[in-house]
Amino acid sequence: PVVMYVHGITSDRTSVMALGHTLASKCVATVAIDLPVHGVPANSNFAAALNVENSALIDFSALYGEDFHERHFNVVQGATGNPALMNFDNPTAQDGSGAWFINLANLGNTRDNLRQSVMDLMNLNASLQAISDLDIATNGTLDTDNVTVVGASLGAIVGSVFTTVNQIAIGNDMSFGSNLNPIKGLVASVGGTQLTQILNNSPTFAPRIQAGLAANGVNVGTSNYERFLYAAQSTVASGDPVNFAETLGTLGVPVLIQQVNGDAVVPNGDPALPLMGTEALASLTGATQFGPGAANVTSTPGYVKMTAGGHGSLLTPSGGAPQVTAEMQAQVVSFVLSSGAQVGIGTQAPGDVEAAP
């Protein structure tokens, strides 16, 4: 089996390693690329090895040429909010990845980053057979008939749209989609719908966004603020899963949605905003919530709520609950190996899985 992993915002392709080792132990190959304006940054533990312009271990220029660059172009958002060069000599928290993916000054750019992400994943999917044919290390070939998408956070948002568009492209025109592999399943971990309201209600992102708007005279609670939210959502809508999730739920693709209750990055939901958050993604796809036990999500999307852990628990222990990482990864592995027919829920941390209603 092959997993296409889609990383979260301000992360990069190397974040897959935290999950890739678990999948590899079950003979599952994992591939990942950077989303637009992301890449291995200066403050990454992998910069010295895997940043294509600054690696001390690998001569990437000999492999790809002198003009090969990370997708963040070594540009960060400086202290004043303006573009600044990434500092590789003395990197700080500022010298990270993906600072320009969400661009409030150019909402069309944000929309296009979302849509470009989908196109990039379609190209990666169409390239899997060519990657397999290379087999440089004679390690075997990729099973391109068994491709699953696993997305975390922004990766779940983008991955939901990609899976939908990929399947529609194949179904509408077999010749057009001849190089596209059908997706056998999607794990959307801590993602959601209605990006603008996710950001506006996120304890992590909202304070920064609201401060930036206030600095330009657009204050929370005013009609101008509501107009901005409306205009922003209208602009990014063509790349937002809020417009794809209902279709996704009808395509016959197994889907597993993971939620961490009290998520401080992507809100679970809000009764006043029924199209926002992880709960909205589950609702729009028609997902059924599962508690501990074996779940079959081949005909109806599945929805699992973790009562402990944090936003990043799929990849790294957070929220003081390392067992949740083992639990969420075990769910992913069983989903991939069974194509959604027998998802093991609660095998590692049954007490941290919310019971089904």
Spans of features found by a protein language model:
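Alpha/beta-hydrolase-fold catalytic nucleophile elbow
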Residues: 34, 186-190, 258
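Domain-level recognition of soluble alpha/beta enzyme cores
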Residues: 1-2
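Serine-hydrolase catalytic core
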Residues: 141, 174-181, 195-198, 203-308, ...
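Conserved acidic catalytic loop of the alpha/beta-hydrolase fold
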Residues: 107, 120-145
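Cap/lid segment of the alpha/beta-hydrolase catalytic domain
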Residues: 5-125
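Flexible loop/turn segments at secondary-structure boundaries
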Residues: 10-14, 37-42, 124, 131, ...
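Primarily recognizes the serine-hydrolase "nucleophile elbow" in alpha/beta-hydrolase
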Residues: 136-200
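Catalytic active-site module of serine/aspartate enzymes centered on a nucleophile-bearing elbow/loop
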Residues: 313-357
